[in-house]
Amino acid sequence: MPISLKVLAPNKNVYQGEAEEVILPSTTGQLGVLPGHISLVTAIDIGVLRLRMNSQWQSIALMGGFAEIESDEVIVLVNNAEIGSDIDVQNAEQDLKEAKLVMTKFPENEKNSEKIKALQEISKAEARIQAAKN
């Protein structure tokens, strides 16, 4: 029996369908979900959700949020998400270059909100690139 998967962002239903396997980027590492998984709620990091159906893998870039897993259902609530095949790789690579350029303006040991935001932008761009290439 396949898993029912929903990926929801505040402004859109990103994905709704079935999967034989789901791999989530939780804040404690990759979390694999198969049918009959134990129920849990977990925080989702910026990263790539991978789903397998009929031996085909699909990727979705996630921008942080939460996931609820119940036996054969996974609901992912995220700040934003993009289906890998919809991502413009060149645009994502340009975003990564720009975010890395912003990072060069900060001393290595300095911590402030602008540096944290730049680090998040790097993570987002890397997730988008990874999702687009998988």
Curated annotation (Swiss-Prot):
Major site of localization recorded for this protein: membrane
Gene3D superfamilies according to UniProt: F0F1 ATP synthase delta/epsilon subunit, N-terminal, Helix hairpin bin
The keyword Zinc-finger appears for this protein: no
Cell compartment(s), UniProt: Cellular thylakoid membrane
Annotated CDD domains: F1-ATPase_delta
Role of this protein: Produces ATP from ADP in the presence of a proton gradient across the membrane.
Listed GO MF terms: ATP binding; proton-transporting ATP synthase activity, rotational mechanism
Organismal lineage: Bacteria, Bacillati, Cyanobacteriota, Cyanophyceae, Synechococcales
Membrane topology designation: Peripheral membrane protein
An example Gene Ontology CC term for this record: proton-transporting ATP synthase complex
InterPro entries, sorted: ATP_synth_F1_dsu/esu (IPR001469), ATP_synth_F1_dsu/esu_N (IPR020546), ATPsynth_dsu/esu_N (IPR036771)
Stated name of the protein: ATP synthase epsilon chain
Similarity annotation: Belongs to the ATPase epsilon chain family.
NCBIfam families: ATP_synt_epsi (TIGR01216)
The keyword Metal-binding belongs to this UniProt entry's keyword annotation: no
Record text on subunit structure and interactions: F-type ATPases have 2 components, CF(1) - the catalytic core - and CF(0) - the membrane proton channel. CF(1) has five subunits: alpha(3), beta(3), gamma(1), delta(1), epsilon(1). CF(0) has three main subunits: a, b and c.
Keywords from the UniProt entry: ATP synthesis, CF(1), Hydrogen ion transport, Ion transport, Membrane, Thylakoid, Transport
